[in-house]
Structures are given as structure tokens and as C-alpha cells.
Amino acid sequence: DTIHRIHPTCGMVVPSFLIKLIEFAEKNQIDHNTCSMKKCVCIGEALRNPDFTLNTLGQRISEKWPSLQLYSTYASTEMQSSFTECSEFHGGHLQPELIIVEFLDDKNLPVKVGEPGEVTITTLGVEGMPLLRFKTGDICYQYTEPCACGRNTIRLSSVLGRKGQMIKYKGTTLYPPALFDILDDIPRVKNYVVEVYTNKLGTDEIL
């Protein structure tokens, strides 16, 4: 009703809500592709894989609403700023006048480009609670090559996972979002709970 009443062209939304909005429109025989919405700045959930392709959630939205442009963001309350995609959709751009970002390993040393690291920030525009090398706990890649849009600042990948949530399973390491993408890709799975525990041998098990 609000969309039809005020005719917005852009919205800021959690991607999962877009899925619910699409389902509501289909259930009520509303053609959401003809509404005024053309772009959405998405918060709270990842839309893309590290190679910039849409993940399962992003694909589901794009398939149902192909005319809607989806822009990913990365932000936190502590930053009071965000990394936001441009129209090239190749990672979130750093705003260097607002924040300094580092990507650190477990020893607090900078990782090499192409290696995942913990996003660590120093705020420049926050007066009430400035932060120096604040560890977010989020693991991301950094991209340093110039973007096709013309900007040459560091860009940020989608979040691979939380540092404390890394799972060691059958000789490899992974983060919960990788499991969620697999489950989200199964049409008949609507809701799920993933349980991870350590067995008697000291290795992780996934249910």
C-alpha cells in the first residue's frame, strides 16, 4: 500500500524482506515488476559471493524481480558509515574521509591482497565514541585495483563469516553462510536450524 501511495523509486531494505514482499504480491495477484521501485540499497544480509556474482538470496530476488537493481552495503553501528556498491557491482567502496580500514590476520598483521582478513576500522568522523583499530569480527576480502566506475579506493567483498564462527570440517574450513547458501538453494526447504558441535575426537560435526 505504501509503495502504491507514495511511489518511491528507491528503498533501503533487508533482502529477506524483499522475498516476503514478492511472495505477498504473487499471492495477491499484484505485478510488482510494474511498481515504481527501481533500486534497493540492501542492508543486514549479503547479496553477493566473493567473486561478485549474486548468491542464492540475490538470485532469488533477481529472478522474481529482474527490473530491480540491488546494491550491497557493509556497515555497523560503530562505523557510522558504510561501504556501498556502485553501479559496477564489484564490491563496496571505502569512504576514506570517514574511516580507515585494515584487514588483519590472527596476529594482528595485515593480510595480503587476495587473502581473507578481519575487518578492522578506525573512525575519522565520529566524535562521541571514536574508535581506534576496532575489530569487527567480520572476515572479508579487499580489492585494491581501480573500479570501472573511476574510483580507486579499496573495495570490500561480502562477509565470508564471523571470526568466531569458523568451522573446521573434514580437513577444510568454512563459515556458516556457505551452508546457508546451500540450504537456501533447495526450493522445498523453507526453514532450518544448523547445529555444529565438537565430537569425542575433537572435530566438528554438522547437523
Predicted feature locations:
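Active-site glycine/GP-rich loop and adjacent strand/helix microenvironment
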Residues: 1-207
